[in-house]
Amino acid sequence: MRTSKRDRIITGALELAHCDGFDSLTFDTLAEHVGLSRGGVIYHFRTKTELLEGIAAAFLERWRTQALAALGGPLEEASRTERIEALTRSVLDGEILPGEVSFMLSATPEAEMLKDAWNTLRREWVGELRELTATQRVALLAVDGWWANRAFDTDGLGPDEPAIADLIVSLVAGNLPDQKLFKPSDKD
């Protein structure tokens, strides 16, 4: 399937942000990067704010799609635990796109759009956090930590092992950990 110009612009903006940060992103550099005229970029996104809104919407759609794939069925038919497990699995197994971290950490007020998009998704899939057990809330923090570790660990030395991912999914479902998981690793 052919990529739309709008999608090309969003992807290009993320690639540039990954290299230079969102704060240095301009329509001119973006147009050159994606092979369009400045007017071609502005046709789809009249302002940088509209571009950032488009990026946030694209992330939200991608996150929803990944969570639905992990769920394997309609959201409306899933229990709360199934929704939380699916969202967790989609984050643990999902890809972090170039520029995703740059967008999250951008100093621009518009970067709040991505945080708002994530919070919207989390409310849809998790519900009220205060209603979860302490174990579940700690597991959700572990999901955030897993994502951050993968985003910043360029050496590939992070704790991204399947057993750890399975433990996080189990905890987020409200299950207590199996004692065998607490034995020290043979790795030094």
Where are these regions (language model features)?
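Hydrophobic/aromatic-rich alpha-helical bundle segments in the mid-to-C-terminal region
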Residues: 98, 111-188
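Generic hydrophobic, amphipathic alpha-helix propensity
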Residues: 5-16, 30, 55-59, 63
